[in-house]
Regions:
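C-terminal and inter-domain tail/linker signature
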Residues: 1-143
Length: 143
């Protein structure tokens, strides 16, 4: 698989699965032995079922959940993406009742693409910012 093809697989996941909730595409793109190497808040398992469940929770809490991809780069089978997620908090999330607030947070993640399927994920999301926007923790005062 070429670098461009690997990037296209990851972009398709971001746009069609995360951004549109198309879980048929999820089934097509994710390897049966997928492993998420980054613990996700909420106790999701580190496998394909856990990733699908996380995506569904996010789309339920933020029905207009989508990402703006700022850039992607690949070294072969690993694709790194920097993106900003956005959405409107219209469903329960982290035990917080819907607030109607528009949220956004940045994420950098790496997905390994093997035989045209996403097989691994590592990532860092700015969940501190998300928690502040949902008033789970107080915003820092400006000096």
């Amino acid at each position: 698989m070429s670098i461009d093809e690997a990037i296209a697989v990851v972009r398709r996941n971001t746009e069609e699965v995360q951004g549109k909730g198309n879980y048929e595409v999820f089934e097509e793109l994710f390897a049966k032995d997928f492993v998420d190497h980054t613990p996700q808040p909420g106790g999701f398992t580190a496998d394909r079922d856990g990733a699908r469940s996380l995506y569904k929770v996010l789309r339920t809490a933020f029905p207009d959940f989508h990402a703006e991809i700022h850039w992607q780069i690949s070294d072969g089978d690993r694709v790194t993406t920097f993106k900003t997620y956005r959405g409107t908090h219209l469903g329960e999330f982290w035990g917080i009742a819907p607030t109607g607030k528009k949220i956004q947070f940045e994420t950098v993640d790496v997905m390994r693409v093997r035989n045209g399927k996403i097989s691994d994920h590592w990532g860092v999301a700015n969940l501190f910012s998300l928690a502040q926007q949902l008033e789970l923790i107080p915003a820092l005062r400006k000096r």
